[in-house]
Amino acid sequence: MKIELVTHKTGEQIPMMLDASGMPVVLPNEFILARRSLSTNTLVRNLRELSVLYRWLDKSNCDLSAKLLAQNSFNEAELKGGLVEALRVDQSNGRISAVAPNTFNQRLTTTRQFISWCMDVLISQLPLSSLDYERLRERKSFLLKTLDGSFMSATPMRKSLRKGLNEAEIDFLLEVLHPEAEQGFGRDSAVKLRNYVSVGLMLFCGLRPGELLSLRVEDIQFGAISAIKVERRPADPLDVRRPRPQIKRNGRVIPIENKQLVFTLNEYIVTWREVLESKSQDESDYLILSDEGCLCRNPQLHSFFSCCDRNMLIIFLTT
């Protein structure tokens, strides 16, 4: 089974499951279309979880719809001794081992939801006078009850206290990233200013990486009380980033209370962002651009923070 991400003309991205011959697998793809309001990453994960189910069905030479409708459908031994055990196995990287309890529970949850949806579809296709209505309702109840009894108790995870940066660490980070700092890093002034603005927006406005990379220039509002507008928009067909940055929280307006950040942000938009954009042939409305003037991607942002971590440690040890 293979998962392909299809980008439509509207910019919407919907994953699709393909079989070994490259043809779409009908039922899981229809199931995903019914859940298209969820994020693309969630839909991709759901299809990967269902691909485990379909590999087991292929290995058992079983057609799901026919089996669900048959007089002799799945019994408890087939479900618990076959399907559930297949969901426990991790076959990535050529190794066969058990997946973590949380991963198994996610697979089982998606499989349960999918089978419930399949049974609802099959029942809805019956004529009103059909004698199979009650039989299929009882079968659905049996299948779901059997799967419900297979969930694992997740092992308690070792929870370490997550520490945010204290005031001294924030001051040190901003001092290192300041565009005029001697020890700052960045290939030119435009990159240094972009780095400072990116970190400042995340520190003082609480933005997530996906929210930062989704910001457009028009979302920055300068005035007596400067603010940024975080807005969930329809998919942008011109956004070629894979995966696309996503805004998972509700839209909101966040005041920018740090005067230095407001001044630097204005300078970046008026002067230095155009310098970055001139390095690329493509124009963009997005606020944060890469060193080459293209749309900045999540891996590039993560790489920047890793670079920050290493450089800050070196500067701290040498000062």
Where are these regions (language model features)?
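Short, low-complexity cationic-aromatic patches
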Residues: 5-29, 33-47, 97-108, 188-193, ...
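Conserved tyrosine-mediated DNA breakage-rejoining catalytic core shared by Y-recombinases
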Residues: 214-264
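Active-site/catalytic core of tyrosine-dependent DNA strand-transfer enzymes
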Residues: 257-319
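Short, charged phosphate-coordinating catalytic segments
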Residues: 121-125, 202-227
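Short, structured motif recognition centered on aromatic/hydrophobic residues
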Residues: 8-13, 23-34, 50-54, 110-117, ...
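DNA breakage-rejoining catalytic core of tyrosine-based enzymes
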Residues: 142-178, 239-259, 280-282
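Basic, Lys/Arg- and aromatic-enriched nucleic-acid-binding interface segment
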Residues: 168, 175-209
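N-terminal core-binding DNA-recognition domain of tyrosine recombinases/integrases
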Residues: 27-43, 50-147, 180-185
